[in-house]
Amino acid sequence: IGMSVVKSNRAAISFGTTSTLQMAVKKYFEPQPYMPAYPAVPNDMFNPEFEVYRGFWMISWFIEQFAAKDKVDAAEEGVCIERYLDDKIKDIEAGSGGLILQPFWTPGITNPNASGAIIGFSDFHTRYHLYRAIIEGICLELYHGLVKMQKRSSVTVDELYAGGGGSSSPVVCQIAADVFGLPVHRIQTHEASAVGCAMVAFISQGVYSSYEDAIEHMVHKKDVFIPNEENHRTYMKIYGKAYSHLASRLKPIEKYLHHFQTGGH
């Protein structure tokens, strides 16, 4: 509710340590088999959710492992490292030159053997292509989740609202808009959970009469990112011809690697 997602045509993306995509629906459904939807704060709704467990944690991982020089350069320019990297990737074409990343640095509950994968390296790729591929991989996986949830619910989402620390980046929000082919809205703060908690408190004290009333007074759209249709077509080709097949093709390999990593041979 902190991002005003109380209508079934809207979904909330959290670009946090764990990256999630959450819907708000009247009719209960499981976003994945045996994975229940959360009860929503409004009593008559549910919040089915799809998550990438190591979501924007991967940004911190990349910076720690590959961006020591970039941190020095960013400090000299007087900008934070994330803004510095945004500037480095904003002109890289959609698809990162054919570099595709499956963002399972830690597996989810439903696929405990899953692992991260990067495919498509060529000699022209740089660490900045990898950085962009991380963001694209997270967005493609969340898009995959939305496709599955829309199919299971017969609900169509046509607006996205972004929160979490990663939403502070306009480059991240534009990539998300281009992947999903939907407008991505930001509100006045990326700390949308805090806004939602405050709403509940104000409603309980009678300051606002309903969630709609609280949203009207407390949630203010800051800006919106409109999809670049050419980029969206590129991402849909990547999703349809490559990304959507990765998990099933890699499953037997991941099973062995999990066995290997836990002491087997």
Feature-to-residue mapping (PLM):
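Acyl-thioester C-C bond-transforming condensing/cleaving domain
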Residues: 10-12, 21
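Glycine/Thr-rich phosphate-binding loops that ligate phosphate moieties of nucleotide
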Residues: 23-265
